[in-house]
A protein has these predicted regions:
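N-terminal helix-loop segment corresponding to the beta1-alpha1 unit
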Residues: 1-182, 205-206, 320, 349, ...
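Short linear loop/turn motifs
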Residues: 256-270, 300-307, 324, 366-384
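Glycine-rich beta-alpha junction loops
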Residues: 43, 121-123, 190-195, 227-229, ...
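A short glycine-threonine-serine/GTX helix/turn-capping micro-motif
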Residues: 151-161, 185, 214-220, 231-232, ...
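Substrate-binding/catalytic subdomain of NAD(P)-dependent oxidoreductase enzymes
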Residues: 173-210
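A glycine-rich dinucleotide-binding beta-alpha-beta segment and adjacent secondary-structure elements
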Residues: 291-344
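Short Gly/Pro-enriched turn/cap motifs at secondary-structure boundaries
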Residues: 209-215, 221-222, 324-327, 346-349
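Aromatic-enriched alpha-helical interface/lid elements that frame and gate functional surfaces
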Residues: 219-292, 296
């Protein structure tokens, strides 16, 4: 159920999107109060259930309905359930749901106010639309890995930004529908989202402007301390931060250099900074550099963040009681009037809410019993 006192209270989202971007979108919407119903396949559910850490991180707070869309009665039940929604979100290959009778044009006939959001790799049209890909390929094609020494990134940026823009599409559509009474069709391509967030790199190139030098300052980098702890300096271009750093590191000859002059001498200055920082432990630099108001910080581990007082004060980690014991999650990042809206329930078991929600949607008891039977007859299994 939705949370009436939260920003998205009263909005129901039915999701047919699996794995990463769709579930990340509905996680954000759910934390902000939307009632999220996840449609899963009865055998195995969302494939990400095979990866417990991933599934738990993305799927708390939702209700699970297991339906085999190849079964005519299950397909009809799915359409009925979608009829109770404000937003439907899907992540199938382009055209698949249309062939099943669950495309935007078909569902809009039932409910003209329905907001329909499709998230896919390359969008619903274009020469790449049917290309299979995961996050690394999206980043490569979008130019994000165009560096002297390309490396596999640690974060799935296409999945993350795809999810965020999918949530943005859902909220945009719901807001528009409330004012106009009509929904709409929102086509989110993960590839497009990466081009959008790479605008500061791509727009200068498109307009034959000089490339920016942000990140080339010798005061922008990672440095090892005497005790092996790594720390970061992020002086992007500011001369006053550089002057403060030179005072803290006893580098008077470099104190008055401009950003352009520093970049010209980047290698030598970077080496000088590294040499000085390596001479003292991290605790020393916490006091000296952070104390001087220089953009500085340690490289935190997951354990560091779990114990961080700032993170605790902002209530970013929230623990809730579940049938499987207490579980800890990271909330969506917005504080709304000082309230840290977060998860209201844990991760659902596969099909846990099928009977409840189909019955509430008015589906005949005999049909509900038949659709639930495969779940009740199977061997009980853990969430994942």
């Amino acid at each position: 159920m939705s949370s009436p006192n939260a920003p998205l209270g009263g909005i129901r989202v039915v999701s047919l999107a699996e794995q990463f971007p769709g579930p990340f979108a509905t996680l954000l919407l759910g934390d902000l109060g939307a009632d999220v119903i996840q449609i899963e396949r009865p055998r195995g559910g969302d494939p990400s259930r095979a990866f417990p850490g991933l599934y738990q991180a993305l799927n708390r707070g939702k209700r699970s309905v297991a339906l085999d869309l190849k079964d005519p009665e299950a397909l009809a039940a799915c359409r009925t359930l979608i009829g109770t929604a404000d937003v439907v979100l899907e992540g199938f290959r382009p055209g698949v749901l249309g062939r099943l009778g669950l495309g935007h044009d078909q569902l809009a006939q039932d409910n003209p106010a329905l907001v329909y959001v499709s998230v896919s790799g390359f969008g619903q049209h274009g020469p790449l639309r049917d290309l299979p890909a995961h996050d690394l390929t999206f980043q490569a094609l979008a130019g994000l890995l165009d560096t002297a020494e390309p490396r596999i990134p640690h974060l799935a940026l296409a999945d993350l930004f795809g999810g965020m823009f999918t949530a943005f599409a859902a909220v945009t559509g719901a807001l528009a529908a409330r004012s106009s009474g009509r929904g709409g069709y929102y086509d989110v391509a993960m590839f497009d989202t990466l081009l959008t967030v790479a605008a500061t790199k791509l727009v200068p190139h498109a307009n034959a402007l000089p490339a920016d030098t942000l990140g080339l300052d010798p005061g922008y980098g990672l440095f090892a301390t005497a005790d092996g702890t790594w720390v970061s300096l992020s002086i992007a271009f500011e001369d006053h931060f550089w002057a403060a750093l030179c005072t803290a590191l006893d580098m008077p000859d470099a104190h008055d250099l401009t950003s352009a002059q520093r970049i010209d001498r980047r290698e030598a200055l970077h080496a000088a900074i590294a040499e000085r920082i390596s001479a003292q432990p991290a605790d020393h630099w916490d006091a000296v550099l952070a104390g001087a108001g220089i953009p500085y910080g340690r490289l935190n581990t997951a354990e560091d963040l779990l114990a961080d007082p700032h993170v605790a004060l902002r209530q970013m980690f929230q623990s809730i009681a579940t049938p499987d014991g207490e579980q800890t999650f990271i909330r969506q990042p917005l504080l709304v009037d000082g309230v840290a809206h977060g998860p209201r329930r844990g991760v659902p078991r596969l099909g846990e809410h099928t009977a409840e929600l189909l019955t509430a949607a008015g589906i005949a008891p005999a049909v509900v019993d038949r659709l639930v039977a495969p779940l009740s007859e199977s061997t009980p299994s853990p969430i994942y």
